[in-house]
Amino acid sequence: MDNQRLFLWIALAFVAFLSWQAWQIDYGPTPPPAATADGTPADPAIPAVDSADDELPGLPSAPGEAALTPASGDGGDGRYVRIVTDVLDLDLTTRGGDLVRADLIGYPVRKDRPDQLVRLLDPSPNNLYVFRTGLRAAGGAAEPNHQAEWAIAEQEYRLADGQDTLEVALEWASPDGLTARKIYTFRRGSYEIGLRYEIRNDTAAAWQGASYLQLRRRHVPLDRSMTDVDSYSYRGPIVYNGDSYEKLDLDDLLEEPLRMTATGGWIASIQHHFLTAMIPPGGEAASLTGGARGDVYTLSVVGPVRDVPAGATGTFEDTLFVGPKIQEQLRAAAPGLELSVDYGFLTIISQPLFWVLDKLHGLTGNWGWAIILLTVLIKLVFYKLSETSGKSMAKMRNLQPRIKQLQERFGDDRQGLSQAMMQLYKREKVNPAAGCLPILVQMPVFLALYWVLLESVEMRQAPFALWINDLSSKDPYFILPLLMGVTMFIQQKLNPAPPDPIQAKVMMALPIVFTVFFAFFPAGLVLYWFVNNLLSIAQQWKINRVVERGG
């Protein structure tokens, strides 16, 4: 029994360590290239991205193909137009009519700098991260692509108080009579952005074309830091083909570009807690492509080709998502988009845990109290199992004097001692393995909750009480890990000590080991384990009293 219990405690630490290692391998960024004097990455084998490095996605010529062709725009930069909603602060450029800057209102980079917001889109060369959208035409016809110059009425647009929807319209016209309106639709509280084109063909010939979405981003690895979980998270492109979700490796894109046709799919760029996604209309096949040049990758979505006869009108619709990975909004935006919240191999447990946590948060208004209530619920679910285990442990605790007598009688005869102890357990109807079950059962729950707290943006910078002002980061003063270590020590005192002196010393050291280990875990996870220990102590103390009275 004692070997099994010791093994399971060590296994818990080992599994947690493996999870940490897997996280680093899965999400760890590639080492950054050497920097130049001005701090920008430099590699003679990697061409710099300049205005000439500009591509347009081609119309699909065969299933899964959307070739890239050189743009033929005027090369101007256009002017910037500001758009502000209750959740987004954006810049749009009239050249291409594209979104090139996005600051997330209410999401500061650090809690102590509320004025410094998380920025997802950025036109600066060192942090290039921009959308490029437009229409492609067949047969060399006029087209309002992302190099076209669009006209717009205002210099700034704001979602007013009491206004639920904001539309921003741009206009374009060709000399031969083709006109287009490009309309962005923003909704209060939403990071989903509608994009609609209204085409009027007053030319003498039919017009044929498709809408496209493109995202260009420079891969900028973060320097790893033990205190910065963002630096270990996966940053890069992902794709969903309507059935499965896949992370795209930058090196693979350099060697072989992605080309696929999917119905109900999407393509996106993610980082810890945030993403930008390009979503074609559902129900129709779209071309999804990805490629890279140097440290810049380009993702594209090309929708189905449509005909607009002479004298007729046509409409093209797409969707962009720019913001935090709020699961409710992700599910509403596109099927499978919630998979960008990566809970790893324990998703089947993590998703129900988050669902319960979310409901409890709705009741309490505080994620810390939601974690405490979740811990109580988990304890209630496994109460009978813990009770059976606790009774077995209490009976074994009462058998300690008799076990000590057996040790003195058999001395170094380990085989004889083992047989005598098994006979004693059998006679007293004690199951020595029962004490291991709660630890074994809690392992997957523990790891699943770890990923929930780490990956769920809902808990990013979420305060609890007193000194805990961010449940997704470590305790800044290490008070909670110390309290957790104390409760582990008390738990051990309530359970029977291992008969082997070496095992006893190892068990006594485990609270110290776990305290150090948990010091770098999210405070919310340590809170869960601390509360779980308190409940286990109360339950075991009650069981010990009952067993001692002969119950």
What is each residue range found by the language model?
Residues M1-D38, L92, Y197, S211-D230, ...:
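Helix-loop-helix
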Residues N3-Q4, G39, P44, S51-E55, ...:
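Short linear motifs in intrinsically disordered/low-complexity regions
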Residues W9, Q24-L121:
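Juxtamembrane extramembrane loops of integral membrane proteins
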Residues D54-P57, A66, Y129, Y184, ...:
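Short non-domain terminal segments
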Residues Y80-L339:
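Soluble non-transmembrane domains of integral membrane proteins
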